[in-house]
């Protein structure tokens, strides 16, 4: 897995170097932007329209979403450790416009 074997990561977009550093350093830079929250099923569509949803897990009680956002996406959201997938989504994903 790249996260464990890479000594340095470069993030480029449109030919421009956005970030460079060790995986640990770069992941720390987005630590406060990765959230999880348990939400009722009816909230999912609204959150998907307004935020980058990295993951969705179903359970009997609620739906757990992993969201990339610079602000808390939901009142009960909590910060979680970022992964390289989260890093990729932070820099390259766009918020869905499912209209």
Question: What residue spans do the PLM features occupy?
Answer:
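ABC transporter nucleotide-binding domain
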Residues: 1-67
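C-terminal coupling/interaction segments
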Residues: 55, 59-99
